[in-house]
Amino acid sequence: MNTTSTHFVPPRRFEVYEPLNQIGMWEESFKNNGDMYTPGSIIIPTNEKPDSLSEDTSHGTEGTPHKFDQEASTSRHPDKIQRRLAQNREAARKSRLRKKAYVQQLETSRLKLIHLEQELDRARQQGFYVGNGVDTNALSFSDNMSSGIVAFEMEYGHWVEEQNRQICELRTVLHGQVSDIELRSLVENAMKHYFQLFRMKSAAAKIDVFYVMSGMWKTSAERFFLWIGGFRPSELLKVLLPHFDPLTDQQLLDVCNLRQSCQQAEDALSQGMEKLQHTLAESVAAGKLGEGSYIPQMTCAMERLEALVSFVNQADHLRHETLQQMHRILTTRQAARGLLALGEYFQRLRALSSSWAARQREPT
């Protein structure tokens, strides 16, 4: 029995939209092996020229497809199409991920740009312009600011806007006729708003505790009264006490006891801060002069600075507890007046900062 060797055409990569090219190669292979058994299903009709048919199919020209073409098209193309669809879906997924990352990068850049504009406005207000130049030391702080701190400043700006809205709402309600249930809802919302600020500060302190401690996110007049990144609870109670009238004897006693407890807690935190400053100074100053390398001192100082975040959180916890205790001592209407007075107090400090900055820019 004579065995004719079959010459296989090397496979060639073809696309879904090139079905006839591969079929042409298969036909050429069968044509070159004429002594090979050929099934009747793929016999080329006698009235067609094999050479011209092969040439037409290899160039993708239209013709009457024979049964083999139909079988190959139906049996081979679905797998190719499914693979191509899967590749397209994967490419689309990666494209969406790249687009999402790009949008996030744009948003971060936008936040940084807004913050730089705010810092520039703040520099103008605080008189950092000298002639036609800018004090770059005052603004160098912005260059190294992390995206987390930029996001905090944006959040704090929205927080102040919401506080102003709540103040207007409380003022309107207290001058009108409203039920205690509606008033209680406004008081609870205002309390939650302050608690939200404490959570925001706690997250920001983990990123840059010096930024929170310095109060750079507040106006200059607010920074003048700053105590461990915020207001001093005992002093604030002293300012707000006249707005609580009329108070019962028991309420007055409770408020005085609360203020005394706040003073004791504030003294303990202040003493802890002084001790931390003392130990931090010793850590930085340790070592011999002229060593050139400060790595051991910096490592020790960094470990001690971790306690600074705890001080900020404890101070905010004291503010949180003071507000809650005042809410417990006062009636709903008294608490609403107290929150209104507290909000207006901060509004007046911000207005004082703006007025002082405007006075500095006036010609003498």
UniProtKB/Swiss-Prot annotation:
Residues 80-100 are annotated as: Basic motif. Residues 79-127, 257-277 form a coiled coil. Residues 78-141 form the bZIP domain. It is found in: Nucleus. Keywords: Activator, Coiled coil, Disulfide bond, DNA-binding, Nucleus, Transcription, Transcription regulation. This is Transcription factor TGA4. Residues 48-79 have a biased composition (Basic and acidic residues). Disulfide bonds join 256-262. Gene3D superfamilies: 1.20.5.170. Residues 149-359 form the DOG1 domain. Residues 39-79 are annotated as: Disordered. The gene is TGA4. PROSITE patterns: BZIP (PS50217), BZIP_BASIC (PS00036), DOG1 (PS51806).
